[in-house]
Structure formats: C-alpha cells, structure tokens
Amino acid sequence: MGESIKSKYTPIYPSKYQGNTKHIICRSSWERKFCQWCDMNNSIISWASEEFSIPYVSPKDNRVNKYYPDYLIKVKEKNDMIKTYVVEVKPYKQTMPPKPRSRKTKSYLTECVTYAVNQAKWKATKEFCEDHRIEFKVVTEKELGIR
C-alpha cells in the first residue's frame, strides 16, 4: 500500500480536526494524501484519524479486538446536508479475496488471513454505521488517483 512510511501530519486548518492535532499518524503515503484532501477540501467540515474504536471478532484467533478506522469525516453535501463517513484507506488488492493458487505459499496464506480480518473489521463497521446513520467507505488507490 503506497509507501509504508509512517509520518505525522500537521493540518493547515487545525480547527477542522477533531482530536489532538499533534498526533495525526499517517501509516502510508496514501493516508497522508487522504489527510491532505480532508484538510484542504472546503466540503469537509470536520475530520478525525483513528480517534475511536469498533469491537470485532477476529477470524485469526476468534477473540474480540479493537478496530480503529482510519478516518471519520463530516461532509457538507451539495444539497447542504451534513453526512458523516467512516473511511478506511486500503490497497484495492486487500479489498478482494485472494485468487486461489495451486501452491499454498506463506505469502498466499498471509493474503488470505489479511482479507478475512479486513472483512471481519468491515462487517462490524458496517453494523456500527447502520446503528449510527453513518456511511462506511473503503478508499483505494483508484479513488486517490494513484496508479
């Protein structure tokens, strides 16, 4: 996923950020690009990065874990309605089930586990969003205009 360079983001418009502006962590260049978009976009009223958690059951160990969605954003729509979104930034490849292979390599098994864990997180997030009248979006390199 993008370059896996962890960095801190300092917003140009800190009043839009909901949380501690000194602790905005970007775990990839793609997340950094999304932070910049949130910060600079006039339609974004407020945004937060990893500021809350959603419990989910991991298929990896069948235990309850905490999932911290990448972003929570409030957007002023064209009709002047305010809409809230939970946003996860992920490579498109991780949003699709791994293609079956004849050899079950370590890499393939890791892809399978990653996909299963993501699906569990996103199922819990969709349920959370339905309960709170929020929309869930997974943003990939396609939406970010990368590649």
Describe these PLM feature segments.
Residues 1-147:
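Electrostatic, structured charged patches in enzyme active sites and in nucleic-acid/phosphate-binding
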